């Protein structure tokens, strides 16, 4: 996709480290002191569930400003079936360009590409205030539970969007994120030493 001075295109192997550093900058001290997302991204690329056709970067005036990626996943339906879906993320925009509409542009483009590949639905963890603008709703409205969250407890972070209308009709079940999203924090700490040193801060609003 090319629009004005914005390009969305597949990620190239030779820019993996540059993209990882961008992700690190975007998530640093946001949800926890430091971040894990750049290591998660590094690990997901080698995961069997990784969808290389849906591994995107965004450029503005030739400079990388964002990325998004998808993983194959499934819902374990209560009737015993496994319903193929996709998981999404990490997705990011560089800190200096957040809240300028680039994130929604990247999100909407990549979701449409997932639809073109035949993806029926996308589930992931996110903020409904942002992702709701692109048609995501809380997954509980589809009858989908998040693994490990007891029934009745808050799972408002768990979002879903049908890409094929009616794809989740009549389905109830449980979603577990693909294994690649679960990383060893000690290994993540070692990986982070490959990047420029940054101060980890405990800040209000962090989740961990």
Q: Across the structure, where does each feature detected by a protein language model lie?
A:
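Conserved glycine-rich acetyl-CoA-binding loop
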Residues: 63, 81, 94-105, 117, ...
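A conserved beta-turn-beta hairpin within the catalytic core of GNAT-like acetyltransferases
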Residues: 74-88, 98
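Acidic/histidine-enriched, glycine/proline-rich intrinsically disordered or flexible terminal extensions
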Residues: 165-208
